[in-house]
Amino acid sequence: MKKLVIGILGIVIALFVGLLVFLIPIYKNLPDPKLLESWTPPQASEVYDAKGRLYGTIGIQKRFYVSIDKIPEHVINAFVATEDRNFWHHFGIDPVAIVRAAIVNYRAGRIVQGGSTITQQLAKNLFLTRERTLERKIKEALLAIKIERTFDKKKIMELYLNQIYLGSGAYGVEAAAQVYFGKHVWELSLDEAALLAALPKAPAKYNPFYHPERALQRRNLVLKRMLEEGYITPEQYEEAVNKPLTVKKENKYKFSDYFLDMVKSYVFNKYGEIAYKGRLKIYTTIDLDYQKIAQKSLEEGLKRVAKIIGLPFLPKSEEDMELAYEKEAQLKRLKRGKIYVAKILKYDGNFMKVEIHGKKLKGEIKGLNTEGHKYVFVKYLGGNRAEIIPDLEGSLVSIDVKTGEIKAIVGGRSYAYSQFNRAVKALRQPGSAIKPVIYLSALLKGMTQISTIDASSKPYYDPSKGEDWIPKNYDEKEYGNVTLRYALAHSINTAAVNLLDKVGFELVLEVGKKVGLDNLKPYYSLALGTVEVTPLQLTAAYQVFANLGTECKPFFIKKIVDENGEVLEENVPECEEVLPKPETRVPVDMLRAVVLEGTARRASVLDRIVAGKTGTTDDFQDAWFVGFSPYIVTGVWVGYDVKKSLGKHMSGSRVALPIWIDYMKVVTRMYPNEDFELPPENIVVNINPKDLVLADETCEGVPMVFVKGTEPHITCSDLNAILGLR
């Protein structure tokens, strides 16, 4: 018996020594927990609007570090009750919790409960990999012990609550409080604190934005555990458990937006490591009020367009498409010509195979990009045929005329659905919106707005096609001689092409470069906007017109300050006169006529002094309106993400202009209703539109702007006298 005991004791000692031999090198090679004393996790940088209001945040991780003193006791207690009930008493690992978890998991036949402490979670997340091996678990336990020997419990809790991922892009309790509730962590109520503590186990599964019922059940479980641990009274429990979820639903898709993406790209490309570290204060030119109006105007305008073209709705997220698809499950049959939501099955060359609840269909892709999407709109064509409907999209850019500051920019109808920023990346044909460049070129050659141009149809050689091309007018009418003013106001295509031929490519391309359109090609179809531009480029070009020949380069970053208060950069307007004021003032008057008597007449409802130009491309693929007051210039584009017709008569006037009006009717009220500056070299005279002479008391007249010396001097009376002599 004695030998047996000695033998067993020897085995135990040998195992213990072997364990020490195995553990000591691992323990010695563990990271030094003192590194946490200087731990500076990536934090968010704050982006402010032009008035100093917080617009949003950017960064690798959305985190705002807060000291333990700012975190309420009920928030701390919620996490302790849920994640580590013995946190205040264990030494880094909790043997009781490990045994309890082992028993529960054994009985369940699967892992349903963990035994890791908060300190172990901290060790794993900050120092170790996520591989599931015995060695990693041992390292985690040993490192947790080391951390407990280095820091007090309050510091460990502070590190944990600032490090933990809580879903929706939020790291730490302060960021999560802002994302889910729109408030600081020290402002959270008991039920709100419990919801945050419900998230570490599975942030996606219990995300209250997407799974409110699960989140509510999990929150109530946290409250129950707080009651069991004595952190709250039965009365507090009853009050909190009966409260509904109160998350800030508008933050569901606010992880970023098109403008924040622009800021992030700019800062990270320019500052690299400094940007990754975060904690910058970035002051921008954007006005939050303008931006909200822009987003609403674009969204409402696209809804109107969607209704016209037959789209059942415009999704804000992929979730919207999924819900619509599920609702279609009750359909008994598909109606030919109707648009449905279909599930994408696979791509087959230039075709896409889709399904609508058992009905498999096939449609041509035509350049459609559905990356990241599982569902798509389709028009049922009968049999197994479908027309794949691309995303209806739009963008809006608004720039301060006098400074070049971008005041609002929206790159699409929903950032959550598509992150592609059409305002700065989408290359689209501007259609007739390019025409002011040609008309200004004619004025620089000595013509006036009442000079006439032959507007008859003529064939022109198109080098891109290698054949003759005859321009057509939107209204399919034929015209004779018309004034430049009338031709621009009514967007007569044949007049624009003939004028381009008369003025010559060299001057037109030169003027294009001066307004920032440096990719114009010497083709006659240029007069109809066959070049590709971004909405930002085209809007910036109109800024030069609105500012009477002075270009102010568009910019959106005013100042960047680092965490120490050092100014990294500060930007001011860069303005330069690129075109003569007198000649540029004349096309501004002509663009005013577009609003007063031409294709943009509906903009006159603004009762403000504005000017602008519609644009519609071939087959109604792109719809534009770019217009301005003396203070603000705004461009709107509407179209599909691929080159596809919006439908017959879906012109810039019908599609884009209403969005522009909705935005400008609010924004222009923030400025004086003043006319455009009249340089001393210009003169305003009343012109009789019938005879193109000076109006006097014998005839009606329309006020028009001329460069002094180019205005007519014959009056209606003079003309009548001359005709009488004949």
Curated annotation (Swiss-Prot):
<feature type="active site" description="Proton donor; for transglycosylase activity">
    <location>
        <position position="83"/>
    </location>
</feature>
<feature type="transmembrane region" description="Helical; Signal-anchor for type II membrane protein">
    <location>
        <begin position="4"/>
        <end position="24"/>
    </location>
</feature>
<protein>
    <recommendedName>
        <fullName>Penicillin-binding protein 1A</fullName>
        <ecNumber>2.4.99.28</ecNumber>
        <ecNumber>3.4.16.4</ecNumber>
    </recommendedName>
</protein>
<keyword id="KW-1133">Transmembrane helix</keyword>
<dbReference type="GO" id="GO:0008955">
    <property type="term" value="F:peptidoglycan glycosyltransferase activity"/>
</dbReference>
<keyword id="KW-0046">Antibiotic resistance</keyword>
<dbReference type="GO" id="GO:0009002">
    <property type="term" value="F:serine-type D-Ala-D-Ala carboxypeptidase activity"/>
</dbReference>
<dbReference type="GO" id="GO:0042802">
    <property type="term" value="F:identical protein binding"/>
</dbReference>
<keyword id="KW-0812">Transmembrane</keyword>
<keyword id="KW-0961">Cell wall biogenesis/degradation</keyword>
<comment type="pathway">
    <text>Cell wall biogenesis; peptidoglycan biosynthesis.</text>
</comment>
<keyword id="KW-0645">Protease</keyword>
<dbReference type="Pfam" id="PF00912">
    <property type="entry name" value="Transgly"/>
</dbReference>
<feature type="active site" description="Acyl-ester intermediate; for transpeptidase activity">
    <location>
        <position position="432"/>
    </location>
</feature>
<comment type="similarity">
    <text>In the N-terminal section; belongs to the glycosyltransferase 51 family.</text>
</comment>
<feature type="topological domain" description="Cytoplasmic">
    <location>
        <begin position="1"/>
        <end position="3"/>
    </location>
</feature>
<dbReference type="GO" id="GO:0071555">
    <property type="term" value="P:cell wall organization"/>
</dbReference>
<dbReference type="GO" id="GO:0030288">
    <property type="term" value="C:outer membrane-bounded periplasmic space"/>
</dbReference>
<keyword id="KW-0808">Transferase</keyword>
<keyword id="KW-0378">Hydrolase</keyword>
<keyword id="KW-0997">Cell inner membrane</keyword>
<dbReference type="InterPro" id="IPR036950">
    <property type="entry name" value="PBP_transglycosylase"/>
</dbReference>
<feature type="region of interest" description="Transpeptidase">
    <location>
        <begin position="379"/>
        <end position="662"/>
    </location>
</feature>
<comment type="similarity">
    <text>In the C-terminal section; belongs to the transpeptidase family.</text>
</comment>
<keyword id="KW-0735">Signal-anchor</keyword>
<dbReference type="GO" id="GO:0008360">
    <property type="term" value="P:regulation of cell shape"/>
</dbReference>
<keyword id="KW-0121">Carboxypeptidase</keyword>
<keyword id="KW-1003">Cell membrane</keyword>
<dbReference type="GO" id="GO:0005886">
    <property type="term" value="C:plasma membrane"/>
</dbReference>
<dbReference type="Pfam" id="PF00905">
    <property type="entry name" value="Transpeptidase"/>
</dbReference>
<dbReference type="InterPro" id="IPR001460">
    <property type="entry name" value="PCN-bd_Tpept"/>
</dbReference>
<keyword id="KW-0133">Cell shape</keyword>
<keyword id="KW-0511">Multifunctional enzyme</keyword>
<feature type="region of interest" description="Transglycosylase">
    <location>
        <begin position="45"/>
        <end position="213"/>
    </location>
</feature>
<dbReference type="GO" id="GO:0008658">
    <property type="term" value="F:penicillin binding"/>
</dbReference>
<dbReference type="GO" id="GO:0006508">
    <property type="term" value="P:proteolysis"/>
</dbReference>
<dbReference type="InterPro" id="IPR012338">
    <property type="entry name" value="Beta-lactam/transpept-like"/>
</dbReference>
<keyword id="KW-0328">Glycosyltransferase</keyword>
<dbReference type="InterPro" id="IPR001264">
    <property type="entry name" value="Glyco_trans_51"/>
</dbReference>
<keyword id="KW-0573">Peptidoglycan synthesis</keyword>
<feature type="topological domain" description="Periplasmic">
    <location>
        <begin position="25"/>
        <end position="726"/>
    </location>
</feature>
<dbReference type="GO" id="GO:0046677">
    <property type="term" value="P:response to antibiotic"/>
</dbReference>
